[in-house]
């Protein structure tokens, strides 16, 4: 099971839970020191040292290198958890020419998924499909995503984050249409408001800090990810979940026509296909 954004937050919490349950986990993270700490925590939980790979999703060549290394190391991948994400204040385009938030939160994971697609398909069995689980957010509701130009610079980091979360859900919708027949089930989920460094930078924190009961731990946020990665009842192609239950998303984030347009433009943006 490959988990991106695994060096902290819900990615790390999910990796620990999966390892504790006996699963072989592969960690992908950006910061070498935090990634090393995550390896130690996952090893303590599962009794085995997990493989780890470093990649900064704001640099697509690093994603390509990590994807190639993982594909070379594993003949099959049962689960890909696309959890890497960032609410970045960087307003300049990445070296690849894209909005930084959109590249980190959408295009990087989209590229990695395609690089590992053969390994996911190799793991698929008639009654036990491979799975792609993507972390979404309520922020999709305020996104201003241009599905024909996903890397277009957004006017604020909040709108960029919302657009990237729209893209996550739309990609799940189209992945389900394309890949369910290959034995790959794509789902996504909203983890809730998380008590972490990432969560404290969200616009909801200014309100939620006065009602601390609204915030959840990283472990609680990761629960639905782990469920979607492992439970037979979670095999709902294109499903959007929260708290282990179906969770509605806006029409803009679930429109099949928009999903297909985004898929085509994203392939061009990451130079795939």
Predicted regions, residues:
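Catalytic loop of short-chain dehydrogenase/reductase
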Residues: 85-93, 98-102, 121-182, 190-205, ...
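Conserved glycine-rich Rossmann-like NAD(P)H-binding loop of the short-chain dehydrogenase/reductase
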Residues: 21-37
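Rossmann-fold cofactor-recognition segment
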Residues: 44-61
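C-terminal helical subdomain
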Residues: 209-249, 256-258, 264
């Amino acid at each position: 099971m490959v988990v991106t954004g695994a060096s902290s937050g819900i990615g790390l919490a999910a990796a620990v839970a999966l390892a504790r349950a006996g699963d072989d986990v592969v960690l992908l993270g950006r910061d070498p020191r935090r990634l090393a700490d995550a390896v130690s925590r996952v090893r303590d939980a599962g009794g085995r040292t997990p493989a780890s790979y470093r990649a900064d999703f704001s640099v697509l060549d690093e994603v390509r290198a990590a994807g190639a290394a993982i594909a070379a190391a594993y003949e099959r991948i049962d689960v890909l958890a696309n959890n890497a994400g960032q609410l970045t204040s960087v307003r300049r385009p990445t070296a690849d020419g894209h909005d930084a938030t959109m590249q980190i939160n959408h295009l990087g994971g989209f590229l990695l998924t395609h690089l590992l697609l053969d390994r996911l398909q190799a793991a698929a069995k008639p009654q036990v499909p491979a799975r792609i689980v993507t972390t979404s957010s309520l922020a999709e509701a305020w996104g201003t995503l241009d599905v024909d130009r996903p890397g277009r610079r957004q006017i604020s980091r909040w709108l960029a984050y919302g657009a990237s979360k729209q893209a996550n859900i739309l990609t799940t919708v189209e992945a389900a249409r394309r890949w369910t027949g290959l034995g790959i089930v794509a789902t996504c989920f909203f983890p809730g408001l998380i008590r972490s460094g990432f969560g404290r930078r969200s616009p909801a924190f200014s309100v939620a800090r006065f009602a601390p009961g609204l915030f959840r731990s990283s472990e609680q946020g990761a629960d639905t990810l782990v469920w979607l990665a492992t439970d037979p009842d979670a095999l709902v192609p294109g499903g959007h979940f929260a708290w282990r239950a179906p969770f509605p998303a806006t029409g803009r984030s679930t429109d099949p026509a928009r999903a297909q347009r985004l898929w085509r433009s994203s392939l061009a943006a990451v130079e795939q296909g």
